[in-house]
Amino acid sequence: MNKIPKKDIFRLLGELEGDVGLFIADEATGEIFTVNGDKLFVACSLIKVPILAMLLKSAEAGEINLKEKISIPIDKMVGGTGIIYNLSPGIKFSWEDMMVLMITLSDNNATNAIIDRLGIDKINSFFAEAGLSHTTLKRKMLDIDAIAEGRNNYTTASDMGNLLFSMAKGEFINSSISESVLNVMRKQIYTCKLPAAIPAVPSYATLEEKRSPMPGKVSVANKTGELPMTQHDIGVFQLASGRKYVIAMLTANLKSDYDGTNAIVHVSKIVYDAFCS
């Protein structure tokens, strides 16, 4: 039986002033529902998820030691989201630490260090090989010069949704990497969008509680992205029954950031209610 509440979603999206891309998938039935799935959006921090997958793939191949520690020079620091630029200069982090910071706190400096290590060209080749045909990395995080030149990072709801759907099934690269990416995403601190109006397992819960939620709870592995008048969130949801579904919702050219955030919150809520009915 189809669970995705399409009519309610169309009604809600019709009230949103701005652009939207939406992907919803039900792992149990294979049903996929999209709205403007191939519409390009500035990726914001969503692009950090496939970058994490590539880092883990490189580590599995023996090309990177995740335990190796590095420090980020002060002259390479950028602002925006994250914590590293507020810490003592010269502090060292392992690549393992960097990847957690990149996702859970959306740390731009951790992300840029990982991009430098992997290489932009190789990252884009990985995206193409992984089937992310509309996802491109043209600059590092908060690269003001690149932005002034018109270079930006792009993706679509379908690229991000299919990526997470593949991971939810344990099929992205392999089951180990799929689960490792989701385990990092389950530690997410930013939960004001997709998880906000549903009984999500809290971010401070143990990993086991997040992987096997109690009755009445839902585990969420999500990653947000935002710029002024642009609000995104993507996530894998797991009910206590074990049933999984995916939502990737991207918005831009909004009347207000609140409108985008509120729309994401409400889409997530009506999808959750439908899957629990």
Stretches with model-predicted labels:
Residues 18-40:
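Short, conserved catalytic-motif segment at the N-terminal edge
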Residues 52-56, 112, 161:
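Short, hydrophobic alpha-helix immediately C-terminal to the catalytic nucleophile
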Residues 61-87:
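Short, glycine/proline-biased beta-turn/loop segments that scaffold the active-site neighborhood
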Residues 5-20, 25, 87-89, 96-99, ...:
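Penicillin-recognizing serine hydrolase domain
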